[in-house]
Amino acid sequence: MGRLKKLKKIRIHREGTHILWASFLLLLLINAALYWGIDCKIPFYVVAVASIAVYLLMVNFFRCPIRLFGKDTEKIVVAPADGKIVVIEEVDENEYFHDRRLMISIFMSIVNVHANWYPVDGTIKKVAHHNGNFMKAWLPKASTENERSTVVIETPEGVEVLTRQIAGAVARRIVTYAEVGEECYIDEHMGFIKFGSRVDVYLPLGTEVCVNMGQLTTGNQTVIAKLK
């Protein structure tokens, strides 16, 4: 499969198309009812301003910038999401590896792009979705107790990297495009978290970390680690 074959060159993410159209029509009907239904126009103006603000926030949330990494991807791990680095630590990974791994976590706020990218080139070895809670995504337990999707990728060098999409207090739906056996590449979308919240990347111990705590990341652009 070509490197850019699955890359969707769109400005609004496909996961947001139906939501944005439905929201636009609903807000239009509400504002039309207020405008034509009451003589006093003050409530209409207040609701109209609020409607525009809410809709612009939703458009911002579902935006889908076209990004190409543009550099050599060998042994490179890129940020799978826009956001802020909230965890860099060794942890026990008990779903797939059952050993110690280096975990780098990116928290996405409501104003971040919520499309997720593959962090490495490789072949998809495992995809799993787990139902769970919707506690705040920055809490340590969120990684194992919240609703989440796990994708394991084996790089061309034979290194396995686990990426976990995690829903938060607001997020209620995780979308994952990965399928076992497919090849995946940096520059391609791995999925989308609707109104949520965190992505964890599990790497082998000894991996060179290229980011710091609190650093802001740009999905598919920021190099977060280099594999040995």
Swiss-Prot record:
Gene Ontology biological-process entries: phosphatidylethanolamine biosynthetic process
Cofactor: pyruvate
Keywords: Cell membrane, Decarboxylase, Lipid biosynthesis, Lipid metabolism, Lyase, Membrane, Phospholipid biosynthesis, Phospholipid metabolism, Pyruvate, Zymogen
Transmembrane domains' residue ranges: none
Cofactor descriptive note: Binds 1 pyruvoyl group covalently per subunit.
Post-translational modifications: Is synthesized initially as an inactive proenzyme. Formation of the active enzyme involves a self-maturation process in which the active site pyruvoyl group is generated from an internal serine residue via an autocatalytic post-translational modification. Two non-identical subunits are generated from the proenzyme in this reaction, and the pyruvate is formed at the N-terminus of the alpha chain, which is derived from the carboxyl end of the proenzyme.
Residues bearing PTM Pyruvic acid (Ser): 197
Active site, UniProt feature: 197 (schiff-base intermediate with substrate)
Site (Cleavage (non-hydrolytic)): 196-197
Coiled coil start-end: none
Membrane association type: Peripheral membrane protein
Localization: Cell membrane
Reactions the enzyme catalyzes: a 1,2-diacyl-sn-glycero-3-phospho-L-serine + H(+) = a 1,2-diacyl-sn-glycero-3-phosphoethanolamine + CO2
Pfam family, one: PS_Dcarbxylase
CC terms in the record's Gene Ontology section: plasma membrane
Role according to the record: Catalyzes the formation of phosphatidylethanolamine (PtdEtn) from phosphatidylserine (PtdSer).
Full protein name: Phosphatidylserine decarboxylase proenzyme
Species for this entry: Bacteroides thetaiotaomicron (strain ATCC 29148 / DSM 2079 / JCM 5827 / CCUG 10774 / NCTC 10582 / VPI-5482 / E50)
Gene it is expressed from: psd
